Swiss-Prot record:
One of its GO terms (molecular function) is hydroxymethylbilane synthase activity. It comes from Ralstonia nicotianae (strain ATCC BAA-1114 / GMI1000). It comes from the Bacteria. The porphobilinogen subunits are added to the dipyrromethane group. Tetrapolymerization of the monopyrrole PBG into the hydroxymethylbilane pre-uroporphyrinogen in several discrete steps. The lineage of its organism: Bacteria, Pseudomonadati, Pseudomonadota, Betaproteobacteria, Burkholderiales. It holds the Pfam family Porphobil_deamC. This is Porphobilinogen deaminase. HAMAP family: Porphobil_deam (MF_00260). The keyword Repeat does not apply.
Amino acid sequence: MSSNARPTSVESPLAAQAPTKLVIASRESRLAMWQAEYVRAALQKYYPACDVSILGMTTRGDQILDRSLAKVGGKGLFVKELEVALAEGRADLAVHSLKDVPMELPPGFVLSAILEREDPRDAFVSNDYADLAALPAGAVVGTSSLRREASLRARFPHLVIQPLRGNLDTRLSKLDRGDYAAIILAAAGLKRLGLSERIRAVIAPETSLPAAGQGALGIESRVDRHDVQAWLAPLHHAPTALAVTAERAVSRQLGGSCQVPLAAFAQWTDAGALRLRAFVASPDGRRKLAAEAEATPATPAEAEALGARVAQQMLDGGAHDILATLGADAPPAT
């Protein structure tokens, strides 16, 4: 079984003995704690007699604020300490923003549930400008990801893109004190914290394709905790899970990490198909490549296959050459 797939052979939550006590591991940022509280409320809805508590933790990713994630180790910096708590039995489950979860989990861990997705798009935030098109030449835009940076450089070469680190409140304060003309954030985080009024415009996927898993919450547990997996089953949202499984399959096969300007976004169509789009670019935005495909996956394996198909299209189109220039662990050319 893939370390990124939800187990399929767990007890029915109706058959499993209801939990009496659960501990949720979470980062301590305001957004992370909101997400943990959201999961706690959902669990208490299904298990009202259960004592659900939150173990707040500071991760290495929270401590390193003077360098971009691409330079200090990437996504794993936000989950390692939480996984240690799971391994040691100090927590039963960990709540993550799925886009921050590495494409390959360490042995012994599994994504046991994926919740229904919030808005997956990027958000344009500015005190002075209505949208990206309104920014003048030389305007400084802050972003925390190479993916957004590459997308912006490809479509708005007249803008100056600068790194932006810190939690959500810190990033907004940097904008408010005038460090940036605008910043790009995930729309989901702003909406979850009741900050929708800060969004001047949501950015269409055609302009900035979202990251794999963006807007979705993933709940991680130990692979041997079948009881936890059963208790989490009512929280699992299958349509979201199939979409993000396809996205993560693309990213995993192309070596996706914070060091790679890679986007992957799957969206259900009105006809019931899953449309998967992917985009990779050099950091300066000059070399870029896109691919897409549709399928009607009913299982995680079929969603993985859709992701593999799009990843192969990318490789056939020259993604290997772009990835190689980044020093990424690019798959061999075929």
